Amino acid sequence: MTAPLTLALSKGRIFEETLPLLAAAGVQVAEDPETSRKLILPTTDPNLRVIIVRASDVPTYVEYGAADFGVAGKDVLVEHGGSGLYQPIDLNIARCRMSVAVPAGFDYANAVRQGARLRVATKYVETAREHFAAKGVHVDLIKLYGSMELAPLVGLADAIVDLVSSGGTLKANNLVEVEEIMAISSRLVVNQAALKLKRAALKPILDAFERASQNGN
């Protein structure tokens, strides 16, 4: 008996916005990860299961073949580097942007002048490093995993690099968005070996995902 395909997803917005894509492929997830304690979820297709992992771990599970394919944000993929992954489709879901934000009244233009030094808090260390290096700005990067908006408020950092959707959280903490680094959306990523060895099983799902993403789900 052939092992089922494994799809890696993270809880939250990506999971919810992937459900219509799965529905387009005729598949429903049998349990809700928000209420189930299970990390391996069956679907209505006996040849497909879903595993629930941290968003930042999706590329790793796919790269090493623990999952055949997955859905990950561009932010996660840029930090990961994309090694060992085939990225055939921008799914146009979980859209937002990665931006630089500073306290209201902070002179960002002066702070990033050539040769200046800036303390930046972020969990996107590699992306932030490349961004500021391209501008000729020396940065001290402070890696955080959450509550990024707090860092400038308590003097830990001058600025943050984080994902922004509506900007409401920034505004609530008296921060302003001063520079967009990149637009973010979630992409389908496929293990390169699985693409060759399980192509017949994968192709109908990948095609359905592509059609649904192009048609706005």
Swiss-Prot record:
Job description of the protein: Catalyzes the condensation of ATP and 5-phosphoribose 1-diphosphate to form N'-(5'-phosphoribosyl)-ATP (PR-ATP). Has a crucial role in the pathway because the rate of histidine biosynthesis seems to be controlled primarily by regulation of HisG enzymatic activity.
Protein's name according to its UniProt entry: ATP phosphoribosyltransferase
Enzyme class, broadest EC rank: transferase
Pathways per UniProt: Amino-acid biosynthesis; L-histidine biosynthesis; L-histidine from 5-phospho-alpha-D-ribose 1-diphosphate: step 1/9
Domain comment quoted from the record: Lacks the C-terminal regulatory region which is replaced by HisZ.
Cross-referenced PROSITE patterns: ATP_P_PHORIBOSYLTR
Pfam families the record matches: HisG
Compartment(s) where it occurs, according to its Swiss-Prot or TrEMBL record: Cytoplasm
Chain's gene name: hisG
This enzyme's EC code(s): 2.4.2.17
Subunit annotation: Heteromultimer composed of HisG and HisZ subunits.
